[in-house]
Amino acid sequence: MARVNHKLVKQRLNEKRSKITDRQFFTSRLFAGHLEDLAAAQTRRYHYNRRVRVNIYWNSKDSFFAATDNMSVKINAGHPFITKTKGRENRYQIILGVFAHELGHILYTDFLAGQTHHNYLGAHKWYPYPPVLATSADARRENAFWEYVKEDPKNLEMAQYIADYISNVIDDGYVENRMLANFPGKLGYGLEELRQVHFEDIPTVTQLIEKEDTEGRHIFESIAQIMLSYAKYGEIKYGEEPLSEERIQVVFSLINDIDTALMSRSGKERLVVIN
């Protein structure tokens, strides 16, 4: 495989748009190779010998942002979250941060455990093992849960969706903490830039409640967003809401569990918290 000319990447990064557009630069094979080489150099310490492939495209109308399948990373550089940032260098840092986040999932997310958890739930079983039922009320709630998921296939689908969503929220916080601790250089700096922009974008609890009224959003979406804010940043943007507000109280009741999951290096143990 031909080596990537990283000096040329830096040159193109500083070129005026009249010579090369952001779309041309960020979707070029040169830039994708630059990220692939960066990942290879950074992950060598983990004896991670498989080359991470990068696919970057540009579509401002596509709601897809970024994802990994544990083999490759796909990023939509034309997503409004990226293009609202002005300047090619600034956009480069955001895309680098997005790549660092997805690379974090490749390095630290237990994809097999996550899929097994999903499949077990589909078979009406807990994975890796049942939650601790400390009280008779806990036992009643567990029985009610299984009755609910067995009642209708759509109920099971919803339970799996919620479990997968919460698992991803926890993993987002976990992998970013690991990336920031282990890669303080180029990848860490890009991730910090991304986190700053993302945190500014997170709505307050007051705004989330307003969206429930104006956009018909479910209260779970608000609670999940508050959980994400805490899991990633250790902060909740309350807005004008008191600490007694029900959504805030739900997340407060889960903080010990969230902290336990964020500190666990075992993907299976994080799934126990999800249960």
Where are these regions (language model features)?
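Basic/hydrophobic alpha-helical interface regions
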Residues: M1-E212, L228
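Pan-zinc metallopeptidase signature
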Residues: P184-N275
